[in-house]
Amino acid sequence: MPLGADNPAGGPVRNKPIRLADGRMLAPNSDESAEAWLPRVDESTDGGRTFRRLAPIPLNRTDEAAPDFMPGVGAIQPTLWESAPGRVHALLRTQAGRVYRSDSEDGGRTWSTAYPTALPNNNSGIDLAVDGDALYLALNPTTGTWGPRTPLVVMKSTDNGETFADFATLADDPIDDRHGREGQFCYPAIVARGGRLHITYTHNRKSIAYAEIRLREGRE
């Protein structure tokens, strides 16, 4: 990805870009420092050859009385999807004990202030794939602001991410120092292709694991 001096779209991109109905590509991104994690979205209009900063995803880190208040340093590693032309959504990794969400009605040019969902998140990476009308989210459903990255599961939504239900467990092994079991299954990447989910993730920080889940019979 070429990035010139006038194109400061670089950053720790973890999750995949998406292509919108209008042909543009959006890449989830963030600016990270010890003081603040600030999520944003970058845009490509030339098929991914170049990207530019498009818009920040606003966070409420000051008004503790508001329902969208986000404790901690902020949010990173958004995962994106488009539910209808121009309607784009993001789920965010946080230190707040929950996955947060933000929505855009104008193709990612502006975003709502991120707000908490019912999905637990202990500051671990997440990723989402779309198959038809269903969303599949890979995450560690662990409460708290820090903790074991186990189990690693896939959850399914059929109402555009308003609610999620258990779908599959990819790995579940509690931490056990006596037997060298670390229980670290994290940083998932998930795509839906040909009626199947394809997922990779870190296995105890020593190797990369791959899982395939068949959604329908045959290949499409």
Walk through the language-model features, giving the residues of each:
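Asp-box/BNR beta-propeller blade signature and adjacent active/binding-site loops
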Residues: M1-E220
